[in-house]
């Protein structure tokens, strides 16, 4: 896995976690 793809994967998973946190907080 190259670094660019890994970074994109981390960014995506981070965004999903952020959405989950926002959803849980409501």
From Swiss-Prot:
Xref: Gene3D superfamilies:
4.10.800.20
Keywords, A to Z, come to: Hydrolase, Metal-binding, Nucleotide metabolism, Zinc
Q: In which pathway does it act?
A: Purine metabolism; IMP biosynthesis via salvage pathway; IMP from AMP: step 1/1
Spell out the InterPro entries in the cross-references: AMPD
The reaction(s) catalysed by this protein are: AMP + H2O + H(+) = IMP + NH4(+)
What this protein needs as a cofactor is: Zn(2+)
Supply one GO molecular-function term.
metal ion binding
Q: How is the cofactor bound?
A: Binds 1 zinc ion per subunit.
Its EC number is 3.5.4.6
Kindly indicate whether the keyword Phosphoprotein belongs to this entry. Answer: no
Which residue ranges traverse the bilayer?
Answer: none
A Pfam family that this protein carries is: AMP_deaminase
Q: State its role.
A: AMP deaminase plays a critical role in energy metabolism.
Into which family does the record put it? Belongs to the metallo-dependent hydrolases superfamily. Adenosine and AMP deaminases family.
| Protein name per its UniProtKB record | AMP deaminase 1
Native species:
Oryctolagus cuniculus
């Amino acid at each position: 896995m190259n670094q660019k793809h890994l970074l994109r994967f981390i960014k995506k998973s981070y965004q999903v976690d952020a959405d989950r946190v926002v959803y849980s907080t409501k």
